[in-house]
């Protein structure tokens, strides 16, 4: 699992959450197009985009969202994101592109926390055992090459659902292991 801030900078280009924040820090649609919150604040029903595919070419569905949530919450995964969702008592696919989250009590930050729910394909996790060396997401960029202690190269996702994005074909993150030379 990735915990270093510098790693999150890379990862946020490969994976996406259900929502994102705009420049004014307002929650906006991302993989989810809309949502309804019950009057008691315990149920969140989200509609998902139907035009999103993983980097491996498979369409993303609500089952992938549920799997990704359950994976984050699994103790054996040890995800640092689990605490963001501790108040959730259930996640279920209510349609091919619809998902419901049920909370034990109202929790105002929950919707924004969905920006950290990176959706992953079950078959890749099961084939690889984890996502330490293989990264298959829905983001604007795909993992192309990792040279340990040297660089990480990402290439544009040709199937990205946002028109005109990404604006560049490749991004390279150089590793600078010596802290005193990073500034």
Q: Language-model features: where?
A:
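Short, well-ordered beta-strand elements
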Residues: 1, 33, 43-46, 65-68, ...
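N-terminal lobe/hinge region of extracytoplasmic solute-binding protein
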Residues: 1-39, 70, 136-138
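Conserved positions in beta-strands of structured domains
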Residues: 19, 33-36, 89-92, 142-144, ...
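Sec-exported extracytoplasmic/periplasmic mature domains
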Residues: 19-23, 40, 53, 70-77, ...
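Gly/Pro-rich hinge or "lid" segments in bacterial periplasmic/extracellular proteins
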Residues: 22, 26, 114-166, 170, ...
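Surface-exposed binding/hinge segments that line
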Residues: 47, 82-124, 145
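Short, hydrophobic alpha-helical packing/hinge segments within bilobed ligand-binding/sensory domains
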Residues: 68, 181-183
């Amino acid at each position: 699992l990735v915990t270093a801030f510098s790693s999150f900078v890379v990862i946020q280009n490969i994976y996406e959450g259900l929502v994102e924040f705009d420049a004014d820090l307002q929650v906006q649609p991302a993989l989810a197009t809309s949502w309804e919150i019950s009057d008691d604040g315990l149920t969140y029903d989200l509609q998902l985009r139907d035009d999103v595919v993983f980097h491996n070419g498979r369409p993303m569905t609500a089952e992938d969202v549920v799997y990704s949530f359950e994976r984050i919450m699994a103790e054996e995964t040890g995800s640092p994101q689990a605490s963001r969702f501790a108040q959730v008592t259930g996640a279920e696919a209510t349609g091919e592109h619809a998902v419901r989250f049920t909370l034990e009590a109202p929790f105002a930050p929950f919707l924004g926390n969905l920006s950290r729910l990176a959706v992953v394909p079950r078959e890749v996790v099961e084939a690889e055992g984890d996502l330490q060396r293989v990264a298959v997401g829905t983001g604007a960029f795909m993992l192309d090459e990792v040279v340990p202690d040297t660089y990480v190269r990402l290439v544009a996702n040709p199937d990205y659902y946002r028109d005109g994005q990404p604006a560049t074909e490749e991004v390279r993150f150089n590793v600078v292991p010596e802290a005193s030379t990073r500034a």
